[in-house]
């Protein structure tokens, strides 16, 4: 019987967890760090806030959020891969304000209106239903709170999109084989990036999820993009 997307994604991330951080740097040529830093500048996270990092993986963005909210704040990181969380647990030890949770982005285990900020970084493309996850993020963020996605995107620059797809389809899996001995897993990850909607379509999904004042910004010619939306104040 064919595996569901969720089952396949789970197997992929359980398999690549030990080399995930190293491969992120290799694949993006370290640009993902700058993308995240710029996104954090746009967020302007306030000390003492409560934040949730969905599909937190090995907790890089979770840690950035913890540094922004400070010890008086609170950060939850949620992921469905136990192996990714094991790597993350070692990294978050210096941050008592962080709690990592094993859970499903499609059904977030939190009450409505809980967090000031809800983020998802390079995880939305891997979920079974983009809109359902965005709706869940909208549900758990407080009125006036911010939902943020940093993800691969589809460039609108002529020729660049083709170059980007060539890199993801042919070069990235080779890097996966060389540096992580995971050609098959990184071949699948390029498919998820290729299938992911462009900036305008993702902005429309943000609005369908109930978010307002939706804005987005392209990085590196559209190789990635940041989207920000707010929950309406009742």
Swiss-Prot record:
Domain of life: Bacteria
TM regions (residue ranges): none
SUPFAM superfamilies per the UniProt record, alphabetical: S-adenosyl-L-methionine-dependent methyltransferases
Pfam family, one: Ubie_methyltran
EC annotation from Swiss-Prot or TrEMBL: 2.1.1.163
Alphabetical list of HAMAP family matching this protein: MenG_UbiE_methyltr
Gene3D superfamilies according to UniProt: Vaccinia Virus protein VP39
Enzyme class: transferase
Entry keywords, A to Z: Menaquinone biosynthesis, Methyltransferase, S-adenosyl-L-methionine, Transferase
Keyword Cytoplasm: no
Gene: menG
Species whose genome carries this gene: Lysinibacillus sphaericus (strain C3-41)
Keyword Methyltransferase: yes
Protein name: Demethylmenaquinone methyltransferase
């Amino acid at each position: 019987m064919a595996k569901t997307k969720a089952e396949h994604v789970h197997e992929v991330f359980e398999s690549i967890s030990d080399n995930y951080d190293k491969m992120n740097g290799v694949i993006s040529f370290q640009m993902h760090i700058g993308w995240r830093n710029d996104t954090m500048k746009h967020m302007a996270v306030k000390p003492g806030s409560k934040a949730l990092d969905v599909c937190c993986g090995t907790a890089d963005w979770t840690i950035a959020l913890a540094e922004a909210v400070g010890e008086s704040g609170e950060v939850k990181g949620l992921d469905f891969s136990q192996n990714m969380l094991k790597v993350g647990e070692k990294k978050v030890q210096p941050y008592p304000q962080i709690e990592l949770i094993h859970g499903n982005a499609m059904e977030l285990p939190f009450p409505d209106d809980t967090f000031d900020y809800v983020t998802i970084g390079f995880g939305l493309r891997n979920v079974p239903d983009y809109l359902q996850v965005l709706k869940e993020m909208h549900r758990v963020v407080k009125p006036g709170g911010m939902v943020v996605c940093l993800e691969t995107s589809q460039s609108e620059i002529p020729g660049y999109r083709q170059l980007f797809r060539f890199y993801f389809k042919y070069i990235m899996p080779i890097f996966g084989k060389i540096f992580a001995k995971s050609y098959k897993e990184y071949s699948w990850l390029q498919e998820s990036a290729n299938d992911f909607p462009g900036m305008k379509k993702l902005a429309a999904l943000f609005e369908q999820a109930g978010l307002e004042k939706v804005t987005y910004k392209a990085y590196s010619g559209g190789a990635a993009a940041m989207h920000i939306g707010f929950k309406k104040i009742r």
